[in-house]
């Protein structure tokens, strides 16, 4: 079987653009197919945790991310009035010239990855929904768009989240999902002058809020709510007004024109190989993690970095698929188990609930690159 020279990526989100950048940087021809005509620009933050920043550095966009974001060190855990409870360290994994972690606007990271991928020669086809991906007769793959065009590539990579194309004319294998009755409401607010690092605020009842500075003017906030709860600005102000002083002050910054992004809490991992009919699934098409410890994004980018590393060896498609699973499957399973436990403790705290111990368990898994 011939070496891979042309990669087709389905989806232009974090995983897809990172995969396109990784493959193009490895010297391969890359085409990206995105169903939407305009880039997704969510008004939300992304927590660039240590292992995520390390992989962004490996992709060549680390310096640009630091310039665009807000570096911080350590996650502070406070009560609703702002009193310190404990701290979770953020080790410096990206090298001494980089901070340990940083906050960014989600859309800014999307922009940086897209620009870098295109600079390295990747071609982006927007408004081109893919209806089918399959193995061709000549040991290559075919990507078929809804307009009927058939695009031949050596490797097709699905990175379109839950929006999966068919595989060889059949529905793609479903990923088992545990849907928790919770949601996170995200927004960008004016940054409190005293906010200089990621902060988890534990209020009364089930209310929690993650607050992360994204630049000198703004901070991202994510408020944990019961699923289906109202997420209008008025509803969020009312929710936070019943909490301690710190959460009250954040709620007061939530103006009527503040857009929000609501994300349900889901946990899933694709059973068995992440490939079928010669087509590879990565990112949220293969695993969906709760947002805890920043691993939902980190694991998606890690998929792309591993893919790029393997492509540099010019493997055949089948050899790459086997090597990719050997590098990613067990590691992703272990990380998925840790962050899912954190989400379940949010839902139903136990006597054994120990967030610092869980963070330490995660750190042991991701300290070394995949």
What are these regions (language model features)?
Residues 15, 38, 163:
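Conserved Rossmann-like nucleotide-cofactor binding loop
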Residues 2-7, 49-170, 178-188, 227-233:
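Conserved N-terminal helical subregion
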Residues 24-44:
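Glycine-rich FAD pyrophosphate-binding loop
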Residues 9-25, 159, 259-341, 345:
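Conserved mid-domain beta->alpha element of the FAD-binding
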Residues 7-9, 30:
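Conserved hydrophobic helix-helix packing surfaces used for dimerization/oligomerization
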Residues 86-90, 94-100, 105-108, 114, ...:
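Conserved FAD/dinucleotide-binding core of flavoprotein oxidoreductases
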Residues 360-370:
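C-terminal auxiliary extensions adjacent to catalytic cores
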